[in-house]
């Protein structure tokens, strides 16, 4: 019996066994915890046992199923590996909602190992050659065989199917997995960036709807989609001309392990790029062109920058230098090198130095969505994610697309001057500091949050810091350490007159107003003096419309530990 016929028969046998159970009160009983860690209902166990009996009649195989985990079926050498979800959409079946399915995927075992784990470890989802999904309630069947296209079967009538050609999200119908829904998904729904959303409750069938063009895409951006949920649908969508990746655009190719989980975006090529851009690491699908900025007053940093250039040359990867780095390196360069002229053409910015170099890079990026690869040449370097020994592995991870990007909040604002004019402030990655022009001279402020007066402050100055900057000047002034991805800001008086004037953490959506009641001050943004403010001026700060993006490296809490040891 060939693999397709076997898969079709397994699905039919499951349908015959499950249909009579609909409405039976014992179908809903939890009989055990399945191999995947979720409760197994009686209906699931019966369906799985029927599938095992169906397989035993025709072949020896390795079965991978949510309920049983791994099982070797038959006494002979296994010929096939079968990935099974006996009832996908168990809740729907128990409530007689006609949207639940049996999903079967089969691959051939060419090499046999006596050790079952060794055998399975050598197999991936790409090795599956046949996928069958049968709607148990209606009998509608979707199937595909590698290299032979995808098909839909209803009441004996067979049709070829293919994905939609929709290219505009606003015109698209999206299938969505809503369990443990993410903030990004909620925002996607709230912003109505699509025509319609559908939540059906059977991932296998929803993937088949994408394969036949009834849905334009299916997404689950949480890392919760299991092998057995998607194995059959994966084969069918691929044969229908679709793309199946994780949320970052990396092709899904799970180990054949019942506990394997992944995020999923299924669609056509045109929509896929847009969905990855919304939910994942959009930079993985952008051509790589590094920008390089280095500390130029440190010979070791210049040497590392030179080695980075040589490494990129050896890989054939494009790069451009900022002008000061170019001038520091021009006598060492062995080939023509471009100076950054259009920041939008840069995909990733490599910063070599300390936190000051990162701040220079952030200012240069000017709000564009360009991830920074930050190499620490100093001590702790809270803004730097990699040490100098990790630079080449960091570059390699970006080239091959296996990296994560962390989004961080910035500050934006303006000064409302006493003469009625406005002065727009540059965005701040770390902090805005309002400080006295003359050392040891006390200043007088009023601090407002969302229009309400919070405190009257006498101090040497005041810091408004992002979480990113909470480990810098703010920390030295007695402010709290805030994890970089937290959505908030901290207001820290510098050497306050009153002991009751303490740091204040506020929501990132708050508007912060600082009114100067006495003396002229300097407004300093990320270490650079922005302008001189006078008595009566108001500094208005809020969350920036743009964010900073960092390629993830060292764990934030590891850096805290290093700080405690200094």
UniProtKB/Swiss-Prot annotation:
- What coarse category fits the chief subcellular location reported for this protein? cytoplasm
Name the reaction it catalyses: NAD(+) + ATP = ADP + NADP(+) + H(+); NADP(+) + H2O = phosphate + NAD(+)
Q: Which SUPFAM superfamilies match?
A: Carbohydrate phosphatase, NAD kinase/diacylglycerol kinase-like
Describe the family membership recorded for this protein in Swiss-Prot or TrEMBL.
In the N-terminal section; belongs to the inositol monophosphatase superfamily.
Q: Where is this region: NADP phosphatase?
A: 1-283
Species of origin reads Methanococcus maripaludis (strain DSM 14266 / JCM 13030 / NBRC 101832 / S2 / LL)
Tell me what this protein is called: Bifunctional NADP phosphatase/NAD kinase
Quote the function comment for this protein.
Involved in the regulation of the intracellular balance between NAD(H) and NADP(H), and is a key enzyme in the biosynthesis of NADP. Catalyzes the phosphorylation and dephosphorylation of NAD and NADP, respectively. Although it shows conflicting dual activities and is able to supply NADP, it seems that its physiological role is to prevent excess accumulation of NADP.
